[in-house]
Structures are given as structure tokens and as C-alpha cells.
Amino acid sequence: MKQKTYDVIVVGGGAAGLMAAIHAASGGAHTAILDHHEVSGKKILATGNGKCNFTNLMQGESYYRCDTPAFVLHILEQFSAEDTIAFFRELGVMTRDRQGYCYPRSGQASAIRNALLRKAEKLGIEIHNGIGIRKIIRENNRFSFDTKSGSFFSTCCILATGGMASPKSGSDGSGYIYAKSFGHTVKKPLPALTALMAEANWLKETTGVRADATVKLYVDGSCVAEVPVKYRWLIMGFPGFRLFR
């Protein structure tokens, strides 16, 4: 059975987990990733319909919905969209800008995933795949990880497990359980995005078609909001992601 100790252990090997591990290792920390998937970064391949919209030039507090949206300004100052583009450029990924949406010039999400994995390997980050974590214990400023593959220990633990919207890709809600066990307060997660159902015969003819459109919100007969979107029509209605965002 394995028994290893690190400065930093990142739980989750998706985009956030890989980026967190890369930055920790770049600062000199002995870093590892524990990923219950057999292949890290798998979810990245499905991002942006397989093209990976990895950042957006249109950023600011108005794009966030919370009690204190201004909190994001400090975060963006630390690592902006421009910093993200420069980061991937150094890894050999050129960017294509489509109205503020940034994609790898190759048009393939695998370019982003492969670049992150190569960088992680270059930095000596140890990625443990197929790890089933039973429990994470924080005691005396040290984290211990009880897994099906052995025990791991670290001074710092970064949770990058995703939410609970896509269990098949790894976002199964386990991160909330770990966070609570560390004493963090977790608000009850609620679904935020869902398709908007509609009954219209023309939807059958346009299913799968992508087009520019305008979404308008009416309250008491008056238009109170209007935003341009790119849509891919569905037979049962409209994709919720564009509408509710």
C-alpha cells in the first residue's frame, strides 16, 4: 500500500485541479493530484462542444450573481483573462478570439488538456489516478488521506472536485463533504441551469442548428433585459445555460 507525503495535495484532476497543482509546483512545492478518474482532464474534452472556451475577455463583477459580486475583482487582478492567454501561449497553445470567447486556435479542447498534462509532468507533479478517497482528516496542521490505494499526507490540501452537476465526469458533490469536515460552511447547493421547455413546431426543423439570437426578459409587459447569444436549438426548447447565465 502506498504511503506518501507532499507539501500540497490537490483533490481533483480537472482543469482547476491541474492549474492549482501547476501553480503550487511552480512555487517550489512538492505537489500531487489525487483523481478518482483513470484519466485526468477528461471533462476538459467536452468543454465548449469539444472546442474548449478556456477564458473570456468580457469579465467583471456584473457577470457574477452573489451577495458581494465585487469580490471577483481581486481574483481577476491576480490572474486575468490576459494572464490566462499568456499562460497557454507559453505552453504552445495559440488563441482564437470569437467575440470575446477564447478558444485554442486548433479548435480542439485536447490542446488545452494536453498542454496542462505536459506542464504538470515537466514540473514533476505526481498524478495518482483511479484513487478512491474514503476520508480526509485535518489534524495538527496536517492532512491525511485514507484511500483505497493507500495513505497520503500533506501540509496543504486544495479541493478542486467541481460541484455536483455531473457525477459521471467527477462532479459528484464529494467536495462539499470534505469542505464541511474541515469546518467550512457550505450553503445548500441548488441546480442553477436547466433547459427551458417550449412547444413550437419549428423547433423540430431547427434542432441542432446554431445561430445568433437575442434573448429578452419581459416583466409586466416591459422589456427589462436584452442580451445577444449564440444558440443551438433543441427539439424540446432552448438550452438553459445561455438563458440563465
Go through each PLM region and give its residues.
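Predominantly flavin-linked oxidoreductase catalytic cores and closely associated redox partners
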Residues: 111, 118-245
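Conserved dinucleotide-binding and phosphotransfer motif residues
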Residues: 27-29, 91, 123, 182
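Glycine-rich active-site loop/strand segments that organize a redox cofactor
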Residues: 51-99
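Short beta-strand-to-turn element immediately C-terminal to the catalytic PLP-Schiff-base lysine
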Residues: 46, 54-56, 218, 244-245
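Glycine-rich FAD pyrophosphate-binding loop
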Residues: 9, 25-49
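Beta1/beta-strand and adjacent pyrophosphate-binding region of the FAD-binding site
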Residues: 2-16
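Small-residue (primarily alanine) positions within well-ordered alpha-helices
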Residues: 16, 20-25
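Short beta-strand to alpha-helix junction loop
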Residues: 72-80, 99-118, 165-171, 199
